[in-house]
Amino acid sequence: MARVKRGVQARRRHKKILDLAKGYYNARRKVFRVAKQAVIKAQQYAYIGRKQKKRNFRSLWITRINAAARINGLSYSRFMNGLLKAGITLDRKVLADIAVHDAAGFAALAEKAKGALAA
């Protein structure tokens, strides 16, 4: 049998990693062994970041809803409880958008929440 030389596969594997390390500084871009570690760590950070992004946005929405609810004389928890009792099912993303862009609409929602809490 003929001897199999693996130069092509090795070059392809190295090129793939070094392409992913584009934009890194110094050895992290140029040296395969260092670049491979840098790429693996970067992919770990990216994976973690995709999970954190969901948490961060939910926290931002809650902060915005809370600020708008307090302007209308309610705390966040009482506002959300009032909406639940009033049968209004809007998610936090939509409520935060209404709070930022449509103050009058949010005030109307707050009044409905107050009415449901009083009843």
Swiss-Prot record:
Q: Name one GO biological process term.
A: translation
Where on the tree of life does the source sit, at the highest rank? Bacteria
Gene3D superfamilies in the record:
6.10.160.10, Ribosomal protein L20
Pfam annotation, one family: Ribosomal_L20
Q: Do the record's keywords include Metal-binding? A: no
GO MF term list: rRNA binding; structural constituent of ribosome
Q: Which InterPro entries match?
A: Ribosomal_bL20, RIBOSOMAL_L20_CS, Ribosomal_protein_bL20_C
Q: Name one GO cellular component term.
A: ribonucleoprotein complex
Q: What is known about what this protein does? A: Binds directly to 23S ribosomal RNA and is necessary for the in vitro assembly process of the 50S ribosomal subunit. It is not involved in the protein synthesizing functions of that subunit.
Q: Which family does it belong to?
A: Belongs to the bacterial ribosomal protein bL20 family.
The protein here is known as Large ribosomal subunit protein bL20
